Amino acid sequence: MTSENNNTEFAELKIRDKIFKLPILKASIGQDVIDISKVYSEADCFTYDPGFMSTASCRSTITYIDGDQGILRHRGYDIKDLAEKSDFLEVAYLLIYGELPNNKQYNDFTKKVAHHALVNERLHYLFQTFCSSSHPMAIMLAAVGSLSAFYPDLLNFFKEADYELTAIRMIAKIPTIAAMSYKYSIGQPFVYPDNSLDFTENFLHMMFATPCEKYKVNPVIKNALNKIFILHADHEQNASTSTVRIAGSSGANPFACVSTGIASLWGPAHGGANEAVINMLKEIGSVENIPKYIAKAKDKNDNFRLMGFGHRVYKNYDPRAAVLKETCKEVLKELGQLDNNPLLQIAIELEAIALKDEYFIERKLYPNVDFYSGIIYKAMGIPPQMFTVLFATARTVGWMAQWKEMHEDPEQKISRPRQLYTGQVHREYKTIKER
């Protein structure tokens, strides 16, 4: 590394006997970043990084992760503090605006979200076009994308107020659409939002109330879901967030952008892992079977995979998993299932064995956020096909914060990844008779 008069540090890259100086961009915390934006214009080369494992696509002030230390912070606040002391809409305000709200700001924000929770009545007809067996994520994906047809005034943006209104509308309407997707999938009538309830209470009300019976929200369940929403609100530049940013970089409307995020999140390697954990725990069946399945997980020739362990970023205990483990116990205790829930018993024993096993320690395979969340959802009465829908409901806040930040960033331009072409160099066309 070398430095020049302005105290900027440089990395040196040697290509074909020529040395190129690349500026090192300083992070406020965490890894610094080598600026390779001029490598192509100056060295006539691209960089190769499958999966973007070592590539920063943007500058961001929203979320910081230290995977080695197991740290997750939003705008500088530790995730555990936010989960234990805050509520979801306060965290939403923090992610979007950069600061925690004062009392007036919080009240104004929550009122705006409640005001926009209703969806256009014509959207109900869209739901009726799906067959009864449709996955709720498929319904949600289509419904969110269709919002652009109902709000053409927000297809182009010129003022900061437009960004804010769009974010609020999205945060407000996604839970309504999520609950509608569930109700339609089980053949029950839709339940309208109730502005007298707070955000989490209202979501539970729309999920479980019926026209003939009101749903009384259990405060322990409400508190648990509030924590789950906070823990899933944002997670830096993951697959779905990057998808939203890439779509947004083209100028696509925000409803379309969020629908692409939902599509990406639907992938089993991203948002569907907690459902896979439940299926795995059911397959294991009992605590006595755990050693057998641990051995299967170590066997390269066995198709069994230990779900809920390991993470693309965390090489330590996922801080979100630590919160959810205790939350899981609180929920099951409230529901009278703490001592007789077989899935929890298997999960706790599986974690204890894995954390002492050299195979998992060497590979830094620790429980992640998906390991306990599915057990909580199941205890709440939320079916597995809704797990990813709830993930998307919470992550919408992060998507909108990232989308807003992207539009306010003067460095951002339309995303255009490059490639290493390894195909045919040149071939002459032959007619079909000559082939």
From Swiss-Prot:
Keywords noted in UniProt: Transferase, Tricarboxylic acid cycle
Gene name of the record: gltA
Source domain of life: Bacteria
Additional observations: Citrate synthase is found in nearly all cells capable of oxidative metabolism.
Enzyme Commission numbers on file: 2.3.3.16
Swiss-Prot/TrEMBL GO biological process terms: tricarboxylic acid cycle
Name the record gives this protein: Citrate synthase
Family that this chain belongs to: Belongs to the citrate synthase family.
